Amino acid sequence: MSIEQLAETAQAMVASGKGIIAIDESAGTIAKRFSSVGIENIEENRRAYRELLLTTPKLSDYISGAILFDETIRQSTKAGVPFPKYMAEHGIIPGIKVDKGAYPLAGCPGELVTEGLDGLRARLEEYYKLGARFAKWRAVINIGDDIPSGMCIDANVHALARYAALCQEQGLVPMVEPEVIMDGNHDISAAYEVTEATLRSLFNALYEQNVVLEGTILKASMVIPGTDCEEQASIDEVAESTVMCLKSTVPAILPGIVFLSGGQTDAQSTAHLNAMNQFDPLPWPLSFSYGRAMQQAALKLWSQDMKGNFAKAQQVVYERAKENGLAALGKWKG
């Protein structure tokens, strides 16, 4: 795929007033989500749930793409239409999570490094044939006593850049996600410092690996205090700190930035995004790539009556998409 085609896909992913829905939960994560609402974790239930999300009527009004898990990209609707084909026909770009998870980084207690580079070229080639047009790789950066170390940041951004270069070689837009974890008692200034250092290192690594930024999307953490911090920040403080951090680290040529919700409540994730989009002008679109913050209300409703509440749960998904789509324009009223 040419640079022009990659850039076109990346721009479509951050189209005005639209975001990405993340439904790429691993087998272990979806098992926990199902267990929390009493749904049996079997393949048919997972397929049916993904169908509920992806076939929500008029979803493409506010959703430009969806990140799938390996199992999901191979599944089909009840009518037998492969999910990627259904998505493409309904204006939603298929994406695929390709990392293999975060594991302890040897020599660095309390720190993690993401694995999955081995065999990635062949997997990306297959995913492209299955219909994927973008991919996602998540790095995990913990904040604690004397962490993250420079070694941890370097190891993770190097892997992100190698992944991104391989994606572009195979015609997929890389979504790079260096998640600064909310767990801990760190304050907002510590979150800012770590996020800034991580993003600075990431874009240096992308440059060194010849990654074309015009065909790349950043999935970023908001600059937010740790969940156990005694002094929580206001919506405006989070928005201002996040925008300032991004402006100091992210090149303006990037097509756009989408945020992860990272354990925020539904209302927080929408309010923070809306507040950030009050800042004008911004060098790039700021939108969303939410998982839990898009799904949890619908999942709870569906679990109460999987047949009877199917359409009602889809309406909840649509409403959450609409709220976040408005927030991506700075027009959410709460």
Swiss-Prot record:
One of its GO terms (molecular function) is fructose-bisphosphate aldolase activity. Keywords: Glycolysis, Lyase. The keyword Lyase applies. GO terms for biological process: glycolytic process. Its EC number is 4.1.2.13. Pathway: Carbohydrate degradation; glycolysis; D-glyceraldehyde 3-phosphate and glycerone phosphate from D-glucose: step 4/4. InterPro entries: Aldolase_I_AS, Aldolase_TIM, FBA_I. SUPFAM superfamilies: Aldolase (SSF51569). It catalyses: beta-D-fructose 1,6-bisphosphate = D-glyceraldehyde 3-phosphate + dihydroxyacetone phosphate. The keyword Nucleus does not apply. Belongs to the class I fructose-bisphosphate aldolase family. This is Probable fructose-bisphosphate aldolase class 1.
